[in-house]
């Protein structure tokens, strides 16, 4: 989007605060339904970040796949859970929980200082390939692959990191 720098910065702060509040809601809210709705807020804010960085295809895929399908599936799964079983295993924090929270808080503070010291306006998030590709001989799926590996490389890698974190979290939850 071609926005002026103050509007761009305001939208970054607004969406960033939406991401932080939604992420805190996912982790801290005791009701799983509210946590699932907070996850929806996080996914929508992430999609709006992609729109802000001119990655419209990735934003549409984020909205359709994650918000439209995965988050709705999570909400339905949480609605069918028995709520009384969820609160049986409540225990106080252990030493490992405290160490983990301190590591997470220090990582969060270092990320916030790095993000606040960086000028995000005018950064080119996509790269263009120097090769000329004849559009007549390439199918739509090949064009999507070419765009994902050239034009939208950084957003594609960021989504893969998000998926890896979600997979590790799902394995950790399934083990319990």
Curated annotation (Swiss-Prot):
GO terms for molecular function: NADH dehydrogenase (ubiquinone) activity; quinone binding. Belongs to the complex I subunit 6 family. Keywords: Chloroplast, Membrane, NAD, NADP, Plastid, Plastoquinone, Quinone, Thylakoid, Translocase, Transmembrane, Transmembrane helix, Transport. PANTHER family: NAD(P)H-QUINONE OXIDOREDUCTASE SUBUNIT 6, CHLOROPLASTIC. It is an enzyme of class 7 (translocase). Pfam families: Oxidored_q3 (PF00499). It comes from the Eukaryota. It is found in: Plastid, Chloroplast thylakoid membrane. InterPro entries: NAD(P)H-Q_Oxidoreduct_6, NADH_UbQ/plastoQ_OxRdtase_su6, Nuo/plastoQ_OxRdtase_6_NuoJ. GO terms for cellular component: chloroplast thylakoid membrane. It catalyses: a plastoquinone + NADH + (n+1) H(+)(in) = a plastoquinol + NAD(+) + n H(+)(out); a plastoquinone + NADPH + (n+1) H(+)(in) = a plastoquinol + NADP(+) + n H(+)(out). The gene is ndhG. This is NAD(P)H-quinone oxidoreductase subunit 6, chloroplastic. It comes from Nicotiana tabacum (Common tobacco).
